[in-house]
């Protein structure tokens, strides 16, 4: 085909996707299947129904004030008597979808978490009305206590006491990354020329951000081995022993291989931190952790060293809500590193944050993240919008109260059926991997062609064209959009398909189309007398 992939070599996979979509959409009367983006086509409905029902209760609460005025004017919610009024609302509307969940939520908050029910309801009502600035700006008080219960249970398996964790509510995982990188630079914890270890393959911005001129960091790749279930070998993880490596970035479970770190890898990192690198900073993005079986975050094994980024986007189908948190242990090496800065650097930071409090040096790193997110001077208006925080709380309560994990198991079964369907039509079983999460599949062209027609054919097929050329051919001839694995730092010729954003019959179509292309290549191979 006429498309020259080389001219697009510097584009990120997500920008390249737009070019692939143009090609895939270029023929009339053909359905374009975009398996390139991870936006799920499923979502949690119960906590959304609860959100809208809560909004109606909140509006009624507001109208308890200024009822003598023109219709449509309300006031701030009143704490006194709110629990009784809410229970009457639940009793009167129990037959409506979402209301029963709200009643259970109040019971769980009061009876299981031991929180003040009136304070919870007042924060939720005030929050959903969006009538006040977020106070505290880092996260609403009761909301933080609830959401951190969810984070600790899902990401750390309860290994970290919830009370030892601080949260910063942010506009999704992407905002979290932007805030963290910028505050690390501003604070002097990362400086130009510093080495950063990056688990590869990885979400592309983790490759691109350190290369920006404002950071100018030296990347040290920590390669996952595709022939060992996409795990980091001991030799690769041992690169973290280098004292010049300041921070380790990773996505766990990985993107795009979609594999969680196994116990050996976690134990290796724990040992390195304990024995050689107690000063190592770790940043882990664990957005896919809820799709894994018995997931354990680096935050659970190295809590003092780790900033945990979690987004509600994938598990709850909430990419448009922009909901995420940054979690930090209250006793962490980021704060310790600030205390070890040279006096000149401390004085510069004293000046930067002087408007926030008298004793700037007591300001924790996570609170500096909040201030830096609004260039310090606007710290008093920082924070995630309160309606967003309310929806985050309802998502968290939905998961916490689902003791049988019915929602989680339904999603796991859904995406795993999709993977099985794709590979069935491709003519092979999916690779067995006990640590696989299956949110994405990295279709390894070399592995697929080898399994279908042998090693000799595989070597020939890979030499015929680049992965990019192959992906453009797939888009042009089949209308299917896959993203190149190399754009995520993979060394293997491969295409990433999301298993979350299409329906099962569409994954069957993808598998058949890829098999057809492989068969056509094999016919060319045979015609050359190479069989």
Swiss-Prot record:
The keyword Repressor does not apply. Optimum temperature is 45 degrees Celsius. The gene is asD. Keywords: Amino-acid biosynthesis, Aminotransferase, Decarboxylase, Lyase, Pyridoxal phosphate, Transferase. SUPFAM superfamilies: PLP-dependent transferases. One of its GO terms (molecular function) is L-aspartate:2-oxoglutarate aminotransferase activity. Its EC number is 2.6.1.1, 4.1.1.12. L-aspartate binds at residues 114, 255, 496. Optimum pH is 5. This is Bifunctional aspartate aminotransferase and L-aspartate beta-decarboxylase. Its cofactor is pyridoxal 5'-phosphate. Inhibited by 10 mM Co(2+), Mn(2+) and Ni(2+), and by 1 mM Cu(2+) and Hg(2+). Homododecamer. The modification N6-(pyridoxal phosphate)lysine is found at residue 314. Belongs to the class-I pyridoxal-phosphate-dependent aminotransferase family. Bifunctional enzyme that has both L-aspartate decarboxylase and transaminase activity. Has high activity with L-aspartate, and much lower activity with D-aspartate, L-lysine and L-glutamine. InterPro entries: Aminotransferase_I/II_large, Aspartate_4-decarboxylase, AspAT/PAT-like, NHTrfase_class1_PyrdxlP-BS, PyrdxlP-dep_Trfase, PyrdxlP-dep_Trfase_major, PyrdxlP-dep_Trfase_small. It catalyses: L-aspartate + H(+) = L-alanine + CO2; L-aspartate + 2-oxoglutarate = oxaloacetate + L-glutamate. CDD domains: AAT_like. GO terms for biological process: alanine biosynthetic process; aspartate metabolic process.
């Amino acid at each position: 085909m006429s498309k020259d992939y080389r001219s697009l070599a510097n584009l990120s996979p997500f920008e390249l996707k737009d070019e692939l979509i143009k090609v895939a959409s270029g023929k009339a009367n053909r359905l374009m299947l975009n398996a390139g983006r991870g936006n799920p086509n499923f979502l949690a409905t119960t906590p959304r129904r609860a959100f809208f029902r809560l909004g109606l209760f909140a509006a009624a609460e507001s109208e308890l004030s200024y009822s003598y005025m023109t219709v449509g004017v309300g006031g701030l919610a009143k704490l006194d008597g709110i629990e009784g009024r809410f229970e009457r609302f639940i009793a009167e509307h129990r037959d409506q979808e979402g209301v029963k969940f709200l009643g259970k939520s109040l019971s769980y908050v009061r009876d299981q978490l031991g929180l003040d029910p009136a304070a919870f309801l007042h924060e939720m009502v005030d929050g959903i009305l969006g009538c006040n600035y977020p106070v505290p700006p880092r996260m609403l008080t009761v909301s933080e206590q609830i959401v951190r219960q969810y984070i600790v249970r899902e990401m750390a398996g309860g290994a970290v006491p919830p009370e030892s964790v601080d949260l910063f509510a942010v506009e999704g995982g992407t905002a979290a990354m932007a805030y963290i990188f910028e505050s690390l630079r501003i604070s002097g914890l990362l400086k130009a020329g510093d080495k950063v270890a990056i688990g590869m393959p990885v979400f592309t911005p983790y490759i691109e951000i350190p290369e920006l001129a404002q950071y100018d960091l030296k990347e040290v790749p920590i390669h996952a081995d595709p022939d060992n279930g996409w795990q980091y070998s001991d030799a690769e993880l041992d690169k973290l022993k280098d004292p010049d490596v300041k921070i380790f970035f990773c996505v766990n479970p990985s993107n795009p291989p979609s594999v969680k770190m196994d116990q050996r890898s976690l134990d290796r990192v724990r040992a390195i931190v304990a024995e050689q690198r107690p000063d190592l900073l770790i940043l882990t993005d664990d957005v896919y952790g809820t799709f894994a079986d018995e997931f354990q975050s680096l935050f659970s094994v190295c809590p003092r060293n780790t900033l945990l980024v979690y987004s509600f986007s994938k598990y709850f189908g909430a990419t448009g809500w922009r909901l995420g948190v940054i979690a930090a242990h209250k006793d962490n090496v980021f704060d310790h590193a600030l205390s070890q800065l040279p006096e000149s650097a401390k004085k510069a930071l004293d000046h930067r944050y002087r408007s926030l409090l008298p004793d700037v040096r007591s300001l924790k790193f996570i609170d500096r993240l909040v201030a830096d997110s609004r260039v310090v001077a606007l710290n008093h208006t920082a924070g995630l919008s309160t309606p967003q925080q309310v929806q985050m709380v309802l998502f968290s309560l939905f998961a916490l109260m689902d003791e049988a994990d019915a929602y989680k198991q339904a999603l796991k079964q859904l995406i795993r059926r999709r993977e099985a369907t794709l590979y069935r039509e491709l003519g092979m079983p999916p690779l067995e991997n006990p640590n696989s999460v299956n949110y994405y599949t990295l279709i390894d062209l070399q592995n697929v062609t080898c399994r279908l027609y042998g090693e000799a054919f595989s070597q020939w097929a890979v030499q015929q064209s680049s992965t990019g050329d192959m992906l453009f051919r797939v888009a042009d001839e089949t209308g299917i959009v896959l993203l190149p694995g190399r754009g995520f730092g993979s060394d293997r010729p491969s295409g990433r398909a999301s298993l979350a954003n299409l329906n099962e019959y569409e994954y069957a179509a993808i598998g058949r189309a890829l098999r057809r292309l492989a068969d056509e290549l094999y016919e060319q191979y045979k015609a050359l007398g190479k069989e």
